[in-house]
């Protein structure tokens, strides 16, 4: 049985987009569910925009999500090198082969000439395509152009009136006519760098890739690549073009929809297992329709035949719900460790000793189950880290009521002789005080909560008071009583 091989081939020109990460994930899931080899290839031929920093970021984000590769720049295999910038001689060798077989040629057209041809085609009501003017240059014509200082590109001869068909694993049979492909295509640019469509064919063929799984925005590239496969006598892989992810307004996911890079979600405190789970369900669903699944369960259930043709919508509310489920199941220590950088960035904490860490654990435990992502702790638990809390005009008016003043003064009096606040003690006092003051329920608890936290809602009040400590609670009571006098 033939060994299946798939690849993820990002360009290190920026952070990984959500759509690209979903493509990487589907390649990974296919490889692990089918026992295939997963190759990571870096397409860094855009020398100006590519950087080692972005390459390292690609490695980091993939590893964070839990995607491991079998071969790649850092995991040498039999078909390397795995960076396109290290494979230039290979591309030139195959380009020369095509020239010798009269399937490609050097083109000396200037940008001005090409632009003029494009304008004329539009004026005639035609789709712009390369005219083919350099297809059959004589040796003398080439020498003249060289003397003029023209640097040639190498163009692949696209056959006229050929019908290119392929069976897409998701979309079914796709048919495209060769005369819609824009004419003879550039395969080597004037600076010697290969174009995407040429390099990707050479790499996929030599790396023995059997299944090319990528976004549907590459469908138009596929017939061009099939022509190159055929011209070089390479075996054509199977293609699967996964539907593009849409925003809530059903347009292509972009920055205007919010965060679009995987790293932005990592930095906000989304858990990798939640993101792995969420992304896997964009276009795919298991037979049992279960939504919350571990990585191992997803791999076990994954079947490429269950990928839908329709475009999935990136539903941030669904992601938040799913991440919340994973946060709830996580040990509090894990959430504390993820929260500390956010609290430091907000200026709420500095160095942390064991005592402070344990206090943080207790504070974060109050909010943990309500977090959609870890960075929310900065706003949710703000009252524990600021000296003074703010009050709205409505809050001040509420606190000015006779019952509110009565409750606050009684609470302050109770604290006067206490060295510290304990949950059991304050709970007992509250029971007695409600009877003695004749103020019960919301009328009793709300003044204390607002005065001490600046919030109308929150975790169990006695726990909040105990964690804030007597000194801060008394300071806030004094301040609010001064404000409302």
From Swiss-Prot:
Record-linked Pfam families? Anticodon_2, tRNA-synt_1c
Q: Which Gene3D superfamilies match?
A: 1.10.10.350, Glutamate-tRNA synthetase, class I, anticodon-binding domain 1, HUPs
Q: Which keywords belong to this entry?
A: Aminoacyl-tRNA synthetase, ATP-binding, Cytoplasm, Ligase, Nucleotide-binding, Protein biosynthesis
Span of the annotated motif 'KMSKS' region? 252-256
Q: Where can the motif 'HIGH' region be found?
A: 10-20
Which residues hold ATP? 255
Sorted alphabetically, which NCBIfam families does this protein's record hold?
A: gltX_bact
Q: What does this protein do?
A: Catalyzes the attachment of glutamate to tRNA(Glu) in a two-step reaction: glutamate is first activated by ATP to form Glu-AMP and then transferred to the acceptor end of tRNA(Glu).
Subunit description: Monomer.
Under the heading PANTHER family, the entry gives: GLUTAMATE--TRNA LIGASE, GLUTAMATE--TRNA LIGASE, MITOCHONDRIAL-RELATED
Q: What is this protein called?
A: Glutamate--tRNA ligase 2
Q: Write down the species.
A: Caldanaerobacter subterraneus subsp. tengcongensis (strain DSM 15242 / JCM 11007 / NBRC 100824 / MB4)
